[in-house]
């Protein structure tokens, strides 16, 4: 090794320094022929290169003339130095010869762990390492008393069968770990256990109450039909479909039959009651027919207009006109409409080929009063002004429409305008209209766009009443 590389309290004298490494000489030797001194290691390295001359004066060297210099070594070892760990905090200083003795006790000196673990650390950190960190340290378990190395103790810790622990199911019980498995499977009130019937898992202290309500709990048929037991959730289906002794209603119950008997006897009842059941079915059909008629009537009432204005489209005009020419007095009827809400119910009729004085030459229009739902609340006879219009379908942007319009005031003495049902008896109501046999001629109806796309539009408007009788 080259010379000493330490922190000297005083600068070493030059004669103590090795000419080769420039440091205070370690194990100095002297060349007796010239008197020069060197570190033994430095001189050996110099000569190993094949140069056998003194490094200082270049005179030939002879190994036999190189001797140790103990006096110089005493002087070098007496030089005062600081500890090599002074920068880390060690305050020791003393002769160089005492350094090794100091390092044997210096708390800052790095030494290997005495337990022969791979760690090297300062002497002052050794106690904590030996107590807490060293994998080779010896530890005794506080629960079972066994001795372990640090590595083995880490595996043992938290697994010791003698350690006192709480139940993992949080039932509050505390016991040695070795008893925990038996407790969890057979003693713990919070352990899970499958239901005997439905196989779902429940906490042990609730499974008893569950089993009394379990849908798969076997129960006996209350009718004692002899099938043994069925699951509770299947019992309604059993009573309804499978139990031969269950009381059932007659399949004609919706028709009015109230008979009830065991399922086994129901077939006999049905066979013996064909005529009564048929009578019930006929009565039911009759009631349903009446209800259907009433619903249709109510639906028709809802679809009837109630603002006193009717716009009636007569489609397929050409075909229907030809039919009217082939069948004299063929009459077309409009949908019914009300003069207002809770008002008079009216209907317009048309003879496309005319009737009476207009037959064969004109379009005839009439209006008649129909029996309405509110007739008892209205003034009679009907006396509201009525206006008929045949609408001109010409484009309003090209020409002003020229509707054909006629207005009349009903004659209060005319029977057609009396309250319906008070006088008509069995008369044919289709002949009771009032209007115009010659509303417009066939010749005039073709002059403008009164017929367009094979359809005509007829408008009927009724003057709104001023009051309803209370």
UniProtKB/Swiss-Prot annotation:
GO terms for molecular function: identical protein binding; protein kinase binding; signaling adaptor activity; thioesterase binding; transferase activity; tumor necrosis factor receptor binding; ubiquitin protein ligase binding; WW domain binding. Gene3D superfamilies: Apoptosis, Tumor Necrosis Factor Receptor Associated Protein 2, Chain A (2.60.210.10), Zinc/RING finger domain, C3HC4 (zinc finger) (3.30.40.10). InterPro entries: MATH/TRAF_dom, TNF_rcpt-assoc_TRAF_met, TRAF-like, TRAF1-6_MATH_dom, TRAF4_MATH, Znf_C3HC4_RING-type, Znf_RING, Znf_RING/FYVE/PHD. Polyubiquitinated, leading to its proteasomal degradation. Ubiquitinated at Lys-263 by the SCF(FBXL2) complex, leading to its degradation by the proteasome. It is a peripheral membrane protein. Keywords: Apoptosis, Cell junction, Cell membrane, Coiled coil, Cytoplasm, Cytoskeleton, Developmental protein, Immunity, Innate immunity, Isopeptide bond, Membrane, Metal-binding, Nucleus, Phosphoprotein, Repeat, Tight junction, Transferase, Ubl conjugation, Ubl conjugation pathway, Zinc, Zinc-finger. SMART domains: MATH, RING. Expressed in epithelial cells of thymus, dendritic cells of lymph node, and in the basal cell layer of epithelia such as epidermis, nasopharynx, respiratory tract, salivary gland, and esophagus. A zinc finger (RING-type) spans 18-58. GO terms for cellular component: bicellular tight junction; cytoplasm; cytoskeleton; cytosol; fibrillar center; nucleoplasm; nucleus; perinuclear region of cytoplasm. It is found in: Cytoplasm; Nucleus; Cytoplasm, Perinuclear region; Cell junction, Tight junction. Its main location: cytoplasm. A zinc finger (TRAF-type) spans 102-154, 155-208, 209-266. Pathway: Protein degradation; proteasomal ubiquitin-dependent pathway. Belongs to the TNF receptor-associated factor family. B subfamily. The coiled coil domain mediates homo- and hetero-oligomerization. This is TNF receptor-associated factor 4. The lineage of its organism: Eukaryota, Metazoa, Chordata, Craniata, Vertebrata.
